[in-house]
C-alpha cells in the first residue's frame, strides 16, 4: 500500500467512528438513566429490564462471531467490510431514535424495551465488527497498527467525550432541552441518529483497504469454525476473559453508579456530571496522543505496572474525598473528579494495550493455523465489550436495589413527567377553540384534575391568562421557566432526603469494584499473555518468510 493511501487512511478511518461512539455512549451509558428518570418502574420491572440486557448480551455471544464470519464470507465490488458499515449504521440510527422517543410506561414499556434492545444488538454489531475488522487489512506493520489504533481511539474518545459532556448537561437540571428530560433525550437521539451516518461516510468513501482476501475462496459460515477459531487460539482464549474483566472495571463508574452518586451527593445538575465525566476522561485524550511514542520506548507489560499504580492513587483520592470530605462542599467534588481522572489514566492505558493484544492474535492465529480469521477475531472485542456492559448493568441494578435508589428515582421521574405535562397543558391551552375565559377555565381544570398544581403555585392567574388568552410569547417563556423551577425545587427536596448510607454505598461499590477488576486484569495478563513485542515481531517475520517461500 503506497504512502499516500496510508496517510489518507490515518485520517479517514478514525473520523468515521466519531459519531458511532456518540451513539454508543448514548445507548450504553445513558439509556438506563433515561429509563430511571422518565419512567415509573417497580422493582420487578427494573429487574426485568436488567434481565433483558443480559439476555441480549448472551444472544450476542452467538451473533457477534457469526456476524464476523458472515463478513469474512462477503464478496462485493465494495469489499467485505463497507456494505455492512452502511446497512448497520442506517438501521442502528432508526433503532436509536425509536428507543428514546416512546411514551410507553410500565410493562408495555418493558416489552418495547426488550424488542429495541435486541434490535440494537443486531444492528450495532453489523457496523461495529466490520469497522474494527478493517484494521488488520489496513496494515500488518506493528508501528503503523499501533498508530492507527491509538489515533482511532483518540477520535472515538473525542466522540465519546463530546457525548458524555453534552448529554447529562442537556438532559438534567437547568439547561435541559425543552425544560424536560423526556423531550431532551428524544431530541439528542434524533441528532445523533442523523450525524452518525454522516461521520461514517469518511470511512466508507475515504478508506482503501488491502483486499488480498479477495484472491482466496470465501470461507463457509459455521459455528464449528467460529468455536474452532476461538478455542484453537490459546492467546485469544486468555485475552477474552482478561479483556472482559477490564471492561467491567472500566465501566462501573460511568455505567450509572457515578452519575447517581454525583446527583445524590452534589445535586440534580447534569452540568456537574458532565464536568466529572469530561475532566475525568481528559487524561485519556493525552494518553491516546502519546501512546504511539510511549509504546515505542516502553513494552506493554512494563507499562501496565505504571498504569496500575496510577489507578491505585486515583481510587484512593476518590475514596478519601468521598468518605472524609463532607465538610468541604464542592471542593470534595473537584477532588473526586481529579481522582477519577488519575484512575482513568491507568484504566484507559489498559484498554489500549488489550485492544492491540486482541488484534495481534490475528497474526498468531495465522502462524499457528494458517488462517487469519481477522473478522471473527475482531468480533471478539465488541462482543466482550457488550458482555461487560451487560454485567455492569447487573452490578448497577443490584446496587440500585440494595441501596433503594429506585425509590428516589421514581419520585424524580414523577416530577419530570408531570412538569412536562403541565407545560403541555399551558401550551395546548393557547390553541383551544374557545373564548378567553373558557380557555383559562379549561387549563385550570386540567391542572387540577391531573394534580399539577405544585408546578403553578408561583404563577398568578393573570400571567396564565396572558398566555392562554392573549397568546403572549414572552409571558409563555416566563411561565414555562417557573414550571421548570418548581420541578427542580421539588427534586432538590427529594434528594435532600437521601440518606448518607446510600451515597456512601454507591461510592464504595464503584471504587472498590473498579480496582478489584483492574487488579485481576493485570495479574492474568502478566501470567498468561505471551505475545509481547519481541514475540509478535518474530511471528510476523516468520510469516513473511513463509509467504516468500510459497
Segments the model singles out, each with a brief description of its role:
Residues 1-550:
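Membrane-embedded alpha-helical bundles of multi-pass transporters/translocases
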Amino acid at each position: 500500500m503506497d504512502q499516500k493511501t496510508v496517510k489518507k487512511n490515518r485520517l479517514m478511518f478514525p473520523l468515521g467512528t466519531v459519531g458511532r461512539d456518540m451513539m454508543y455512549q448514548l445507548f450504553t451509558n445513558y439509556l438506563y438513566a433515561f429509563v430511571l428518570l422518565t419512567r415509573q418502574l417497580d422493582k420487578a420491572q427494573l429487574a426485568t429490564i436488567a434481565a433483558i440486557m443480559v439476555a441480549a448480551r448472551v444472544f450476542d455471544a452467538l451473533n457477534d462471531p457469526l456476524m464476523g464470519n458472515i463478513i469474512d464470507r462477503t464478496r462485493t465490488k465494495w469489499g467485505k467490510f463497507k456494505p455492512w458499515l452502511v446497512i448497520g449504521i442506517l438501521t442502528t440510527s432508526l433503532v436509536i431514535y425509536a428507543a428514546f422517543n416512546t411514551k410507553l410506561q410500565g410493562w408495555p414499556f418493558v416489552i418495547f424495551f426488550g424488542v429495541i434492545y435486541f434490535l440494537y444488538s443486531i444492528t450495532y454489531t453489523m457496523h461495529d465488527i466490520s469497522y474494527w475488522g478493517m484494521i488488520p487489512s489496513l496494515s500488518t506493520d506493528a508501528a503503523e497498527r499501533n498508530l492507527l489504533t491509538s489515533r482511532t481511539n483518540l477520535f472515538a474518545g473525542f466522540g465519546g467525550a463530546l457525548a458524555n459532556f453534552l448529554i447529562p448537561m442537556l438532559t438534567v437540571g437547568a439547561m435541559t432541552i425543552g425544560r424536560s428530560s423526556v423531550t431532551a433525550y428524544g431530541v439528542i437521539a434524533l441528532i445523533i441518529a442523523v450525524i452518525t451516518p454522516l461521520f461514517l461516510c469518511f470511512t466508507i468513501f475515504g478508506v482503501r483497504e488491502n483486499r488480498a482476501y479477495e484472491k482466496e475462496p470465501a470461507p463457509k459460515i459455521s459455528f464449528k469454525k467460529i468455536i474452532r477459531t476461538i478455542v484453537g487460539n490459546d492467546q485469544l482464549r486468555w485475552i477474552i476473559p482478561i479483556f472482559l474483566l477490564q471492561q467491567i472495571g472500566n465501566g462501573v463508574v460511568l455505567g450509572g453508579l457515578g452519575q447517581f452518586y454525583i446527583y445524590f451527593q452534589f445535586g440534580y445538575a447534569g452540568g456537574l456530571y458532565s464536568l466529572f465525566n469530561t475532566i475525568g476522561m481528559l487524561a485519556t485524550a493525552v494518553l491516546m496522543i502519546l501512546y504511539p511514542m510511549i509504546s515505542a520506548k516502553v513494552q506493554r507489560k512494563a507499562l501496565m505496572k505504571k498504569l496500575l499504580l496510577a489507578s491505585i492513587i486515583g481510587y484512593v483520592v476518590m475514596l478519601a474525598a468521598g468518605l472524609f470530605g463532607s465538610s468541604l462542599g464542592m471542593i470534595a467534588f473537584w477532588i473526586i473528579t481529579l481522582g477519577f481522572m488519575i484512575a482513568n489514566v491507568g484504566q484507559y492505558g489498559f484498554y489500549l494495550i488489550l485492544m492491540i493484544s486482541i488484534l495481534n492474535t490475528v497474526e498468531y492465529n495465522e502462524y499457528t493455523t494458517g488462517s487469519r480469521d481477522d473478522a471473527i477475531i475482531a468480533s471478539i472485542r465488541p462482543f466482550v465489550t457488550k458482555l461487560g456492559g451487560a454485567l455492569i448493568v447487573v452490578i448497577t441494578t443490584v446496587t440500585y436495589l440494595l441501596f433503594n435508589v429506585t425509590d428516589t428515582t421514581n419520585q424524580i421521574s414523577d416530577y419530570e413527567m408531570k412538569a412536562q405535562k403541565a407545560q403541555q397543558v399551558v401550551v395546548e391551552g393557547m390553541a383551544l377553540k374557545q373564548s378567553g375565559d373558557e380557555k383559562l377555565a379549561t387549563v385550570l381544570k386540567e391542572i387540577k384534575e391531573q394534580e399539577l398544581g405544585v408546578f403553578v403555585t408561583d404563577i398568578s392567574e393573570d400571567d396564565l391568562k396572558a398566555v392562554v388568552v392573549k397568546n403572549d410569547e414572552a409571558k409563555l417563556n416566563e411561565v414555562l421557566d417557573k414550571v421548570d423551577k418548581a420541578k427542580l425545587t421539588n427534586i432538590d427536596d427529594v434528594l435532600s432526603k437521601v440518606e448518607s448510607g446510600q451515597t456512601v454505598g454507591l461510592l464504595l461499590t464503584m471504587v472498590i469494584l473498579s480496582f478489584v477488576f483492574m487488579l485481576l486484569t493485570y495479574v492474568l495478563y502478566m501470567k498468561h499473555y505471551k505475545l509481547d513485542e519481541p514475540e509478535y515481531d518474530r511471528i510476523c517475520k516468520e510469516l513473511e518468510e513463509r509467504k516468500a517461500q510459497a
